[in-house]
Structure formats: C-alpha cells, structure tokens
Amino acid sequence: MQKIRRDDEIIVIAGKDKGKRGKVLKVLADDRLVIGGVNLVKRHTKPNPMAGVQGGIVEKEAPLHASNVAIFNGETNKADRVGFKVEDGKKIRVFKSTQKAVDA
C-alpha cells in the first residue's frame, strides 16, 4: 500500500516549488509523482496536422520525487506524515499527527 496515492492533496517541501500545493495526477513506478500545477516545464512540440497538434512551446507538469512532497492535512492546514492502522481487518492510511483516516 502506498503512502501517497492519486487525488491526494500534497504540499511540496523541497525544491524550486517549495510551499506549493496541488493534487496528485499520476503516481509513477519509480517513486515519482505528477502533481497538477507544480514543477512546470516547457516542452517544444512539432506541429502534427494529422493529430490536430498545432506545435510550439507547451507547459506541462514534470514528475517530482515522492521524498520532496508531503501529504496535506486539511484539518491542521499543515504538511503531515502518513501511517497505517488496521481497522475492522482492513489496513487504512492515517495522518500521524491526528490519527484520523486520510480517505475519510
């Protein structure tokens, strides 16, 4: 079970985008995350009339390593860590500071 999953609200704790918040769009296999509106890079694309792509300079999100982000706890309005707890025979994710379920 992963500590950070798709659609989690996160905050960047290190790097050029430190302090920015966003939602996880994609979780990649090598402990990297694509976060909406964070770590934007410019990519030069060729026009492709067959696919309807105009071409030019496009801004898109680049992956960040999971060690540079922390899950955002809406209750405390701070970055938090994730722990695990077994309730009713199921393993759930909980915030370390409040011990409340992340997915609640």
From Swiss-Prot:
One of its GO terms (biological process) is translation. One of its GO terms (molecular function) is structural constituent of ribosome. GO terms for cellular component: ribonucleoprotein complex; ribosome. Keywords: Ribonucleoprotein, Ribosomal protein, RNA-binding, rRNA-binding. NCBIfam families: rplX_bact. Belongs to the universal ribosomal protein uL24 family. One of two assembly initiator proteins, it binds directly to the 5'-end of the 23S rRNA, where it nucleates assembly of the 50S subunit. One of the proteins that surrounds the polypeptide exit tunnel on the outside of the subunit. This is Large ribosomal subunit protein uL24.
